[in-house]
Amino acid sequence: MLKKSVYSIIISISALIYAENDQYVLLVSMDGFRADYLDITDTPNFDKLSKNGIRSEGLKPVFISKTFPNHYSIATGMYVENHGLIANSFFASDLDKYYSMRDRETVENGNFYGGEPIWVTAERQGVKTASYFWVGTEAAIKGVHPSIWKKYDQKVPFEDRIDSVMTWFSLPISHRPRLIMLYFHEPDWTGHKYGPSSSKTVDQI
């Protein structure tokens, strides 16, 4: 259901861009989705995207290969030693504080996030952005949030997240975000718990 819905978003955005001759970016992360997952079960919608677009052979993560450092590296284009988010949990000696992805106060503290993520750059240029659970967007980094953002809540169904993104792309031009970043915690959570080749992980894929 998830992969079918995400494919629908991409098709809808393509139609929107064609109709209005404008540029939009949707960045989707399915955490822990290994490159070879596309080959261990049927993924017809990903196959369509691969056939009509492009598919890489893999992705080399930054070290350490954890969720928060890598997602923030994607957003900033920086290595972890430069943007400062060096792990999911760590002690920041310069701030004399402990950071944890499970601690709401630190997650929302912009002082932990170095560099300039893409949504901050865009907002400063007058380009509206939106995020559904992307790492870093809950903090006011350099005093800036995305125009639309959500506090992380893993219990929010994937379908609800997708519906929200579709709604954002349907907003009036003056309020419509041109960059949207969407995060799903699967298949990472299931893959860690049951293993990458388990039937439960395959079901998530």
Give the role of each language-model region.
Residues 37-38, 192:
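Short N-terminal helix/helix-N-cap motif within the alpha/beta-hydrolase-1
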Residues 2-10:
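Sec-dependent signal peptide recognition
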Residues 39-83:
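Short, structured active-site-proximal loop/turn typified by the sulfatase FGly-forming signature C/S-X-P-X-R
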Residues 10-19:
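Hydrophobic h-region of N-terminal signal peptides that target proteins for export
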Residues 79-204:
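His/Asp/Glu-rich, glycine-adjacent segments
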Residues 22-34, 49-50, 74, 122, ...:
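Beta-strand elements within well-structured catalytic alpha/beta cores of enzymes
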Residues 10, 34-35, 59, 106-107, ...:
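A generic structural signal for short
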